[in-house]
A protein has these predicted regions:
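A domain-start/cap signature at the N-terminus of enzymes
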Residues: 20-37, 91-163
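Solvent-exposed alpha-helical segments and adjacent loops
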Residues: 416, 427-671
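Active-site machinery of serine-nucleophile hydrolases
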Residues: 162-229
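Gly/Ser-rich "nucleophile elbow"/oxyanion-hole loop immediately N-terminal to the catalytic nucleophile
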Residues: 154-161, 211-243, 253-259, 304
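Mobile cap/lid helix-loop segments that gate and shape the active-site cleft of serine hydrolases
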Residues: 171-184, 257-303, 307-308
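Short beta-strand immediately N-terminal to the catalytic nucleophile in serine-hydrolase-like folds
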Residues: 238-240, 263-265, 313
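C-terminal catalytic histidine-bearing segment of alpha/beta-hydrolase fold enzymes
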Residues: 313, 317-415, 420-421
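Amphipathic, heptad-repeat alpha-helical segments
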Residues: 20-78
């Protein structure tokens, strides 16, 4: 359904850079973020001294607060100020000295004020209204990450009421350092500030459309907000415009049971057509890249909008109207109709009358809230990374990167399920929510086969597993030996960087000098790019210093070869790709070890609940930074990299071979 509104236009600008054909040249890639500007030495020294002083005060405060967990939990709210200025100086990220030098002084002053407040036991920001910036420590890399809040004037910290929360995803801004983000979030409340609503502005680890580590940032920031504010779980909404609209599409599509509503504006919703239309790029993906588009193409998850009220917006003459048009087409194929508000004769901005109409609809949906137990769920996925919608969970797939589809419906005391490409399912209804009659057994019909479900316990919960064996469904968990692909342990390589990870560098010498040089270059490239693009410093240890506790709590990112990295040598015989001094063997294929390096992800033989990765960081590279629609995993579960071809802005070398492991993490020839 398209709704057209006409009124005199007031333009709301969105910070963005116009991408185009100039950004389609692999050999000529500009820097993102851009290079910093030169600042006077006396100003640099002044800010450096201020940041160092703030760091010392934070460290002293941490010592003084030992044993006071509630107060210690507030330290990230101070550390965000230090990081913002410290990083701007250390990494030459003062981009506009006229604005950012005064802003840095303000942030240092605010950081010192919070130090004093916390030392006095009066952290006033914890109960403040208006524009508030806060932070949390990420489990991924131990870094401090910021977020902004708009706290309504009606908020009272001692009031037990639960608040509606709207999450706002920001647009593309290549200059959005922590310094600029904190400054913006203390000046600009944003496009939408509904009454009696807390608005969360995520940083998203810079400029990635809430993908990969940026996706994790949403949930970590949300968890931190919940610690400090009483949030109504059934009235959390997601919104965004431009790159934020793209983020909204993908977060809504992958997590449809989490939110009360979604309101994406502009942006993009898939990779191939957007790059063709908006970027004028001739896209020629490898077969595995094309499969990996299924991770973030929201169009592939269009069915999931059956479960989530959604109001899309586009300007009539905005090139990014393409995003909602593509979603409308994909939803129509699922017999769904997209509500699409269109601002007449409007480019890349919100039309004021359209904003009113969006608010009318979204506020009405929010007043109803999310249904915690819908009678019917229709859910699709391509990977177990995204496996849950409301009370339905897909636990195993027949084959990753092919579509799985499940429809589940409650019909009085019968549960009916129809499935495709799913081999294990769970139904999880929280205490008090199960609608079935506790006095009778529940009838379950899966793909036409009738099963007897367990009775409802006295707390009115219901948690039941189903598995498929030999083409038939049974009640209970699957009986499995060895490792299998499951949620959080399904690949591809980039998945290792969506939970806590530890980089393990080699202390020995590689068997081949060329391999050693490549390892050193790519390890440095990864740690530098993680800092620049995911705004954290990767934790790094020598292979000789890794402890049992490290192995228990982290994905291990091993660099080197069996000769140079003792951990790689230890686990190597248990990996499906054999790596000897002269040869790398992948099934029946052999590669010369003097010029080929395996990169892979696999359940860690030393801790099968965590990953081990060989010789790879996250797989998007500098070319992909230039348009966010390119920021999709580039390598599958394993790859053989021919290092005789030097790394460039797209690849770590020539990809001699690559593929996905099967559902039992076995080598397979299937594509």
């Amino acid at each position: 359904m398209r709704t057209w509104l006409s009124i005199t236009l007031v333009v709301f600008t969105i910070v963005a850079r116009a991408d185009g054909p100039a950004d389609n040249i692999v050999e000529k890639v500009r820097s993102v973020p851009p290079p910093g500007a030169k600042i006077p030495d006396d100003v640099r020294n002044e800010l450096r001294d201020g940041a160092d002083k703030l760091r010392k005060e934070i460290d002293s405060l941490r010592d003084n607060l030992k044993g006071k967990s509630n107060a210690l939990a507030l330290l990230p709210d101070i550390e965000i100020y230090h990081k913002a200025v410290d990083w701007a100086l250390r990494f030459d990220e003062i981009l506009n000295p006229t604005n950012e030098i005064p802003a840095a002084r303000v942030l240092l002053k605010q950081g010192m004020e919070r130090v004093q407040q916390l030392r006095d036991g009066k952290p006033v920001w914890n109960s403040a209204t208006g524009l508030v910036v806060r932070g949390y420590v990420s489990r991924l890399d131990g870094s401090v990450q910021p977020y902004g809040l708009v706290v309504p004037a009606t908020f009272q910290s001692n009031n037990p009421r639960e608040w509606r929360l709207d999450v706002w995803f920001h647009g593309r801004d290549e200059k959005l350092t922590e310094l600029n983000f904190l400054t913006q979030r203390q000046k600009d409340p944003g496009q939408f500030t509904p009454r009696n609503t807390i608005v969360l502005h995520t940083y998203g680890r810079y400029c990635n459309g809430q993908k990969l580590a940026g996706e994790v940032d949403l949930f970590e920031a949300l968890a931190d907000v919940r610690k400090n504010y009483a949030i109504d779980d059934n009235r959390i909404l997601v919104r965004g415009f431009s790159l934020g609209g793209a983020a909204c599409w993908q977060i809504a599509a992958h997590y449809p049971g989490h939110w009360a509503a979604a309101a994406p504006g502009a942006g993009f919703s898939e990779t191939a057509d957007f790059l063709k239309v908006f970027q004028n790029e001739k896209v020629q993906p490898t077969w595995f890249e094309q499969k990996l588009w299924h991770q973030y193409d929201a169009t592939d998850y269009a069915l999931n909008f059956f479960n989530l009220p959604t109001v899309a917006y586009s300007g009539e003459i905005d090139g990014q109207k393409q995003a909602a048009d593509m979603m409308a087409k994909a939803m129509a194929a699922e017999q769904l109709e997209l509500t699409h508000i269109i601002g007449p004769q409007t480019r890349h901005a919100y039309h004021p009358a359209s904003k009113l109409e969006i608010n009318r609809r979204i506020d009405s949906i929010a007043a109803q809230g999310r249904d915690p137990l819908p009678k019917r769920v229709r859910f699709t996925t391509w990977t177990l990374r995204y496996n849950t919608c409301s009370w339905l969970r897909i636990d195993r797939l027949g084959k990753h990167w092919e579509r799985a589809k499940v429809t589940a419906e409650i019909d009085e005391n019968t549960l009916r399920i129809e499935s495709e490409n799913a081999t294990a399912l769970s139904v999880v209804m929280a205490p008090g929510l199960c609608p079935f009659d506790a006095a009778n057994r529940i009838r379950v019909v899966i793909d036409g086969k009738e099963l007897a479900g367990p009775r409802v316990p006295s707390d009115k919960s219901w948690d039941v597993n189903f598995h498929k064996l030999g083409g038939r469904w049974y009640v209970g968990e699957p009986h499995e030996e060895g490792t299998v692909k499951r949620n959080g342990l399904q690949g591809p390589i980039d998945d290792a960087f969506m939970s806590s990870f530890l980089v393990v560098r080699p202390t020995g010498t590689t068997a081949h000098e060329k391999i050693g040089a490549w390892v050193n270059t790519e390890l440095a490239h990864f740690t530098n790019e993680w800092r620049r693009h995911f705004r954290g410093e990767a934790r790094v240890k020598d292979d000789t210093a890794v402890t049992d506790a490290d192995i228990a709590s982290n994905n291990l990112i091993l660099w080197g070869d069996p000769a140079s990295n003792r951990l790689l040598s230890k686990i190597g015989p248990k990996l499906p790709i054999a790596w000897a001094a002269q040869q790398v063997k992948v099934g029946r294929k052999d590669f010369t070890a003097s010029q080929n390096v395996p990169a892979l992800i696999y359940p860690n033989p030393l801790n099968p609940d965590r990953y081990v990765v060989l010789n790879s960081g996250f797989t998007i590279r500098e070319y992909d930074y230039l348009n966010n629609a390119r920021q999709v995993p580039k390598l599958p579960d394993w790859a053989i990299i021919d290092v005789s071809t030097p790394p460039n802005s797209r690849w770590p070398g020539k990809i001699a071979d690559a593929g996905f492991f099967g559902e039992r993490w076995e080598l397979t020839d299937r594509r």
